[in-house]
Amino acid sequence: MKSDNGILMSNINKPNKCYYYCIISEQWDELIYNITGGKITELRGTYVHPKLIIHIASWCNPEYAIKVSEIVLSYHAKEAIKEKEKLLQKKNDKIDELSLKIDKQNKQINKQTATMKKQTKIMKNQTNMMKDQKSTIKEQDKKINELLSKSNEVLGYAKDTNRKITHVVKERVPYSDEPKIEHQFIIMKNNDEPIKPKKGESPKKIYDYTALRIMNKSKSSTMNRYFKDHPDGETILTIDYTPNAMHLWNQCKKELIEDDKIKSSGTSSSSFNLKKGYSENKLKKDIKRIHNLRLKHPE
């Protein structure tokens, strides 16, 4: 059997035939060609493509075929080793990369650990300082309590003394060398006429009495203002001299309200009405009594 190029194909086995046709299918013009003419006889003969000559030689010489097999096996072994080395190198690179990351993390951990140790030491020192301070505070509290106990005792004596001094200052002040700055306490009866409210308005509350606390120097202007609001007002009680007219009225008002004898227009007001059963004469007697009681020295 001959090929298209005239080569005998009778001794070519099936795998080699496949190889031959695979080479033919590649883009080479000729795989096997003959040179028969020409002046140079040394060039005459059959020429084969380099990819095919090795197989032809292997067909012709078993020893050569073994040699080719060894070379091929060695080549494949080297390629396998190269691939394995590449894979190992890749893994080694990955290991190196991970090692660098681990080293970096370890450095950070070590740094954080050192910081935490430092902070722990500081906290221990602060705790010890707080314990010392707590002990000091307890000692100070003990001393403070002792001082408070003593000061409370002294304060009690001081309050009692101050109460007596205050009473003397308020109630036993001698007459001033300047009468114009002395106080007067006056109770006025207003005698106001009820005012009919306008449509839609509530009736205005009428108070029958007014307490005036005035200084002699301003008595005229104070009375003028009073009579402007209460044209028909009249004086029912005058205490010509009292060291503190405001204090006197507050004391009178407090007692009379508590005894349900008067109704005041407000806590800071001087206008009031008498309760049922309580007369004008009783009012004057009570005010004089309270004024005289204030002049007595407390025990």
Curated annotation (Swiss-Prot):
Q: Which InterPro entries match?
A: DUF3627 (IPR022549), KilA/APSES_HTH (IPR018004), KilA_N (IPR017880)
Which keywords appear in this protein's UniProt record, sorted alphabetically? Coiled coil
Give any Pfam family that matches: KilA-N
Give start-end ranges for the coiled-coil region(s): 76-150
Asked if the Swiss-Prot or TrEMBL record annotates the protein with the keyword Coiled coil, the reply is yes
* Residue stretches making up the KilA-N domain: 1-75
Q: List the protein's name.
A: Putative KilA-N domain-containing protein R879
